[in-house]
C-alpha cells in the first residue's frame, strides 16, 4: 500500500495513488470491497481459469466506467494529498494510478511539496531515478 523510502536526507512516500483519488466514490467503494478479507479469501479459493475470467471482466468494466467519468473525478483530491503529506510527515510523494505523468510542485503551509506521478505503462511509460541528491521522472 504505502511505503516510506529514505533517499539520503529525503523521506519519500511511495504509494499506488488510488487512495488519493477520493472524489471517485464508486472506485473507492469497489476498492474497499475487492480488498476485503472475505472477498479475497473467496477469490483465492477459485481456480486460476475462473480468476482470470473475473479479472478480465472487471478490467473491461473498469475501462468502460473510466471512459465515462469526468477527468477531475479521476485525478487526486488536493486536500487528500495534503493529508498524506501530513500523515506521513514527508514533502515527497511518488505514485501512479492516475497515469498523468507529471511533477507537481506546490506550496502547503509555507513549505514546498513534490508529487511525482508515473505515466501509464501502455501510453507513456516512465520511471523514477535518484542520483546526485535529485529525484528525476524519466521516460522509458
Features from the language model and the residues they span:
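Conserved catalytic scaffold of divalent metal-dependent phosphoesterases
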Residues: 1-88
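Conserved beta-sheet core of the metallophosphoesterase superfamily
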Residues: 11-13, 18, 23-30, 75-138
